[in-house]
Structures are given as structure tokens and as C-alpha cells.
Amino acid sequence: MVTYLLANFGGPRTSQEIVSFLQALLTDRDVTGGMIPSMLHRPLFSYIAKRRAPHVARQYAYLGGGSPIFQDTERLAQNLSQELQASVIPFHRYLPETHRETLQALQESQGSIVGIPLFPHYTFAVTGSIIRFFLQHLPEKPISWITQFGVHPEFVSCMQQHIRDCLAAQQIAVEDCYFLFSVHGLPQRHIRLGDPYAQQCQASFEALRGELEGKIAFQSKFGIGKWLDPSTQEVCQSLRTKKRHIVIVPFGFVSDHIETLHEIDHLYVPILLQKGYRVVRIPAINASSRWVSSLAAIVRSSPQETSLEPLLMP
């Protein structure tokens, strides 16, 4: 008997959870570690989270006060459970209010556990953090992990068809489009530590792009230090093409949330509109009717990692 653990980023369901969400995220040393000494890390980033909360709350107000990622992940877990004919337990990494229920369900599970982080590309800061969480909180339950699927044929074909379907629904010809494949950024210091994220993103981009005209860019930078480039904002500012439509494809995000629904729509789309382009943001792959069956195929055919130390931030 196999139990599947479907792990996503998590997001505040209401405005009341914004502070706890930000504190869980910013005090995670896999995300913000290395910036300051460890003894100062938690108190400083807890303070920063509280200071940032009003600003972030205004962004979430645009989404109705909370993120759709929670409900999307819960629904995906239910649908995937039916597809796999197995128990699928959802996990929301930075929504601490839900952790006790997840840990209890896993503790009571029988047989093996397979973790499915909903991130196409592996990074210490996200998938690595999820793996570390369970090593710390559930050490008696070994979990094998599907660590990446950005070049898996099912992901690539599902995403490509999703793009075509979205454009066809708006009667937009692919030939009249320039494609901006946007993925979450990462500090370059992580790459120097051996993080494979940049390489995996590039390989995934090349597989997805095929014959399409476009480029990859990195969004959502925060904090100090140099991050992967080019940034999505810089590409939008410098972009010159004879194509009428700019199609933004957030291919690193399985579910829509604040970084697609607010950041792309409010920061990047206006830049392109001011330059006279028509802009289309492709919804995250979670909106594809094929996604559940494609994810099930990915789960059935992907290798599982059991040697976990090399997967963690050094």
C-alpha cells in the first residue's frame, strides 16, 4: 500500500493568516539562511514578516483576501487520489495551521510514502525545505521523493497543449506570439552551493519552447545579493519584437497564486501594454483539463529519491 504526499507552497486562506504565512516563509533558513548569523535569523525575519504584512495584505486583497493555492491543492489531491486509486495527503509548506493534520495523517498511514512536491524544478530552497521538514518532524516515517519533473514528457506535452488551448480560446495564432517563459528566481549563491535549479529550468524551457520564439526570465526577487538573470521585469522593459502578442508562461508554477495573479498582472503586464503589445498570461498548468492524468503518469513513471542528504542545502 502506498500513500502519496502532495506538497505545495501553501498560502494564506484569509487575511488573518498572512502574518503566520510570512513568518513561516521568511524564517525558513533554506529560504533566507546565509544572509545573517543564525542567532539573529529568526527574530529579525519574524520582525520583517510583521512589517511586510500590511503591504502583502494589500496584494492579497486583489485576490479576494487570500490565495487560491490552498483550495487548488486540496482539490488536486482529491482528483489525484481518484486517478491513482490511492490515498493522497496534501501538504502546505508555509501554512503552519495545517501541519498538525498532515503529520497525523501520515503517522497513521500504512505502507510506504511517496512525496510529490508540486515544483517542476528542484531547488534547495523549496523542495529541499519540504524534505527537511519531514526529516525533522516525522523521522520515523521514511519518505521517497519525486524531486523534479520539468522535462518529463507528460509535463512538457501537457504544458504545450495547455498553451495552445489558451491561445485558441482567444483566437490568437501561435505564429503571432512572442513567448516569455517566466520562472521564480533564485539567489546565485544557491547555485554556487550546487543547487541544480538554474540548469533544470533551462532544460525545461528548451523542451517547452520547441519551435516557439521566446526566452526565459526569472521573477520574484527579494532581499539582497545577485539573483539569476535576466529578470522578468528587465526582459519586459527591453523587449523588442514584431510579434503583436506577448504570451507570459509561468511554467515553474503549477498553481496560480500571488506571484502569477498579482505580480505578473500588476508589475509586468503594464510595462508591455505601454509599449503597445497585446499581452496574454497563460494560467498555471493546474487549470489544464489534462493535468490530473498527466501528473498521475508522472508519479507512476518517475524515479524516487531515497538518499536525501545530497538534496538538502549544505
Curated annotation (Swiss-Prot):
Keywords: Cytoplasm, Heme biosynthesis, Iron, Lyase, Metal-binding, Porphyrin biosynthesis. InterPro entries: Ferrochelatase, Ferrochelatase_AS, Ferrochelatase_C, Ferrochelatase_N. Pathway: Porphyrin-containing compound metabolism; protoheme biosynthesis; protoheme from protoporphyrin-IX: step 1/1. One of its GO terms (cellular component) is cytoplasm. It catalyses: heme b + 2 H(+) = protoporphyrin IX + Fe(2+). It is found in: Cytoplasm. SUPFAM superfamilies: Chelatase. Catalyzes the ferrous insertion into protoporphyrin IX. This is Ferrochelatase. The lineage of its organism: Bacteria, Pseudomonadati, Chlamydiota, Chlamydiia, Chlamydiales.
